[in-house]
Structure formats: C-alpha cells, structure tokens
C-alpha cells in the first residue's frame, strides 16, 4: 500500500498529532486542544407542531485541534463524527461532514453539538486530549462539467428519496 505523506504543523505545543486507533482503521482520530474544558450544548428540539420550524436554542461548540495540515494537491480531508459520540452521547458534527481543502492552512477545528435533549446536564464536557472527530484524506478527482440537453436513461430514472426500496 502506498503511503501519502501529509505535513502537519502544531500550532500549540500541547496539540496531539493524529493517530489511527487500530491497524485496520479507515480514519485517524483528531484530538481536542483546549486550555480549559468546553461544554457542548444540546439542541432543544422540544415539541414541533405542524407548520412550525425547528429552531436551535443552543449553539454548537467549536473545538480546536491545535493543528494545521498541508494536504497534498488533488486531495481533501473529510472529517466525520466519531461513532461512539453518536451512540453514547448523541454528539455529532454540526455540519455533518467537515471538508478541509488542500489550500487551507489554518487550524482544523470541529463544530460539535449534542442532540441529547434527555440528558440531565444537557451538556457534554470536552477536555484537552479527548478524541473529538475522525478524519480521512482521500484523492479528489478533477471534474469537468458538460452541459447536455438530455441525460442517459437508467432503470431508476428520476426516483429519489427511498425510491430504491426500504
């Protein structure tokens, strides 16, 4: 297997370099780099009546990693929620998937929010060194778009949102 060399700059001496949790892990872990604890507030969804919009009453918490990456041209870093956060604490990335472009050189940060409105404390405390997300760096194909009057036919056609089965 070819290994992609990625340069990483510690913006904080206490930042933790990314590591893979196991030999077969698809993603590497990103760690919180915090001087103090941070609390991740929940979204209070309350009762939603027909015609009402769902409004967030708490804001997401941005947690820095203390790291900047030099992602090779033609690649992108994708940041995902950790599965344990979702299953155990209902914590997720507020933007679902983070996208770090190859020309970005600033600190990689993660925006976390908890949907656990049943929790007594309604917050999750994140401490320095906690694993806050997982990420992978993948090749990004160059794409050229071609406008056409008609697209080719498929069995699925225009069916979307559950049209392929349960």
Language-model features, listed with the residues they occupy:
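Non-catalytic terminal segments and appended small domains
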Residues: 1-166
